[in-house]
């Protein structure tokens, strides 16, 4: 049970680090390339999730998520004993990350109450107003919101943390890795 739990956690952390969303936000304010391909309709090198979400240039938003995921996976030592067809099975409980807890820990930098993790999965409006700019008014030093629409661009929601957590839970239950879309 401990080996499967550790293997599942290792796979979850590997999937988190390999995610284009994680990598793009982790790249910080210096990166202006949208390699997660969530920002549809903006040119290559004209912005990234880090700038569009509006993180401060000194923020490291992934660190808190990374710490939470690393702290998860506690195995409860007392198993449930199941007897079936002359066999005895032991079922262990493992604490998995809670997406709602992650959402509570990740508020949008400019909009209290809404989570940027949830926004990545559900959608973020205003991409057509996003202007790549090195303006001192920009928190990220990457871009600002223009007063008028600049282009027909849309944010493409993507299953992110929920897919990673669901794959982790499935691995714990079945012992089989899930393929995540990149």
Predicted regions span which residues?
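Short, Lys/Arg-rich flexible segments
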Residues: 1-182
């Amino acid at each position: 049970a401990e080996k499967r739990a550790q293997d599942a956690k290792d796979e979850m952390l590997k999937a988190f680090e390999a995610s284009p969303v994680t990598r793009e936000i982790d790249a910080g304010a210096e990166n202006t390339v949208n390699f997660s391909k969530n920002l549809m309709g903006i040119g290559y090198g004209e912005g990234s999730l880090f700038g569009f979400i509006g993180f401060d240039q000194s923020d490291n938003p992934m660190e808190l998520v990374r710490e939470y995921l690393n702290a998860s996976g506690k195995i409860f030592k007392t198993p449930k004993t199941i007897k079936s067809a002359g066999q005895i099975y032991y079922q262990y409980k493992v604490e998995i990350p809670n997406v709602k807890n992650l959402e509570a820990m990740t508020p949008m930098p400019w909009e209290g109450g809404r989570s940027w993790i949830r926004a990545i999965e559900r959608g973020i409006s205003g991409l057509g107003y996003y202007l790549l700019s090195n303006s001192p008014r920009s928190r990220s030093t990457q871009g600002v919101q223009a007063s008028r629409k600049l282009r027909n661009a849309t944010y493409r929601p993507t299953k992110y943390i929920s897919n990673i957590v669901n794959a982790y839970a499935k691995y714990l239950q079945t012992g089989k890795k899930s393929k995540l879309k990149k």
